[in-house]
Structure formats: structure tokens, C-alpha cells
Amino acid sequence: MLYFIGLGLFSEDDISYKGFKALKSVDCIYAEFYTAKLMGGNIDNLIEKLDVPFITLKREDVEDANVIIKEAMTKDIAFVTAGDSLMATTHTELYVEAINKGIKTQIIHGSSIFSAAPGISGLQAYKFGKTTTVPFPDENFFPHSPYDAIKLNSQMGLHTLVLLDIQAHKDRYMTVNQALDYLSKVESERKEHVFDDDRIVIGIAQAGSKHPIVKGGRVSDVKNFDFGKPLHCIIVPANLHFIEAEALITLADVDKELLKDFL
């Protein structure tokens, strides 16, 4: 048996009761924290409560998947991730391979940024388009794909959830400020008015915590806001329903004057 279990957004306390019971029942737990990480707690606290062998995998271990598949053929195994299960391509590949090998599977979902970000900002979840990710740039690596996703979504009147790069093995997490600088640099190269300084954006930090940070405004203003500890993400709104506009004023501290065209 192979369980796919989402641990939730922020800390080890976010796991569902159903997920916790499943983890107590298995022979071994494999965890992956390179696509997302629980920033608000200590996973060791959960491990102590479970008293089950707990192995944290490297990226290449998940991409290979042979160890997990082989174990699940004869034992009850859990594959756990922060957030919701099966949100990454490599996780889906593992799920499909397990089914093709005749291994029994069960998915136990967890809270995710995909639902939390629209909720805490007051935006309607069904009005979001393609999600994109801003990566850490390198000497020969500066993709424009996040800019293109925002452009395409905006043309269709859809909001964009922008995830920010995570390099957990280096303890390196992109901030809202870094991502806005990245997108502004693309704008300076492309000059297509997709991400001008007066574009409204929403920065979010520590979603799932007791006191998440949600701050909106012009790009030029939000760039200078201190969002504190990671994890961070950004929403780039498109056309707003008046209820969404009212919510952004209250929930994201957006200046009412910036939203007057939607009220």
C-alpha cells in the first residue's frame, strides 16, 4: 500500500486527523521537502508522535522512485509532502507508476497555497489562470516564462498566482521583493506594459500561520514592504469583481483609490 499524504501549509500541526492516523499505521514514511517546506514548526515533533521510520528524500530519490515502489510492493508506505499531495509532476509520476505496478494507493489531501492564497486575499478562486513560478536567476538562466504567464492570464481577465523559488537544500527562499525585481527587470527588457510599476500586486507571506501577511498595492510600493519570514508568494490580479476589490481594501490593505474603477 502506498499513501500520498499532504502535511498542510505551515507546520506539523496542519496534517489532517485522517492523515495522522494513516501515518501511525504504516511501516515507513518517505518525505520530500524540496518543492515545499513546513516553515512554522519542527517536523521532528511529528516524527516523535508517530514512532515510525521517517526518511527524508533528495530530489533525485523521488525522480528515481525505485526505492519507494519496491518497498510499497510488500509494505505499507507513506509518501508525504508539505501542502497538498500530488501537486508536483514528480509526485504524479510516482502515483501513476504505483498504479501501473498494481500497488494499492490512497490519497489524503492537505491544505495548499493554491486554495489558501485566493482565500486570504479575498479573490475568487475560479478566476485564476495558469500558475507560474519565478526562479532564482543565474548567469545563463533568466527565463521570461513568469512574465508570459501573467501576460496571457491578464489578456483573459484572469488572476495569476506566482509561486517563488524554493531551494530548501540551500536554505534559500525567494522573497516577494526579489520576485518583483525579477519581473520588473523582464518588463524593462520587453517593454510590453505587462508589469509596469503601477501594476497592482498582492504579496503573501506565511500562509497557514496564525498571522499571515497579506499586502497589496502598486509594484513600486510593495517592492519596499518587509514581508518577513518565508514562504512567500504573489498574486497579480486582473479584472476585479467589486466584491474582490472591497476584499482587497480590507484584507490586503490596498489603497481604495487604486481600486476605484472596480467599485
UniProtKB/Swiss-Prot annotation:
Annotated InterPro entries: 4pyrrol_Mease (IPR000878), 4pyrrol_Methylase_sf (IPR035996), 4pyrrole_Mease_sub1 (IPR014777), 4pyrrole_Mease_sub2 (IPR014776), Dphthn_synthase (IPR004551)
Signal sequence bounds: none
Superkingdom of source: Archaea
Keyword check for S-adenosyl-L-methionine: yes
Example GO molecular function: diphthine synthase activity
Binding-site list for S-adenosyl-L-methionine: 9, 84, 87, 112-113, 164, 207, 232
Pathway membership: Protein modification; peptidyl-diphthamide biosynthesis
Gene Ontology BP annotations: methylation; protein histidyl modification to diphthamide
Keyword S-adenosyl-L-methionine carried by entry: yes
Function: S-adenosyl-L-methionine-dependent methyltransferase that catalyzes the trimethylation of the amino group of the modified target histidine residue in translation elongation factor 2 (EF-2), to form an intermediate called diphthine. The three successive methylation reactions represent the second step of diphthamide biosynthesis.
Subunit structure: Homodimer.
Family: Belongs to the diphthine synthase family.
Record's protein name: Diphthine synthase
Organism per entry: Methanosphaera stadtmanae (strain ATCC 43021 / DSM 3091 / JCM 11832 / MCB-3)
Gene that specifies this protein: dphB
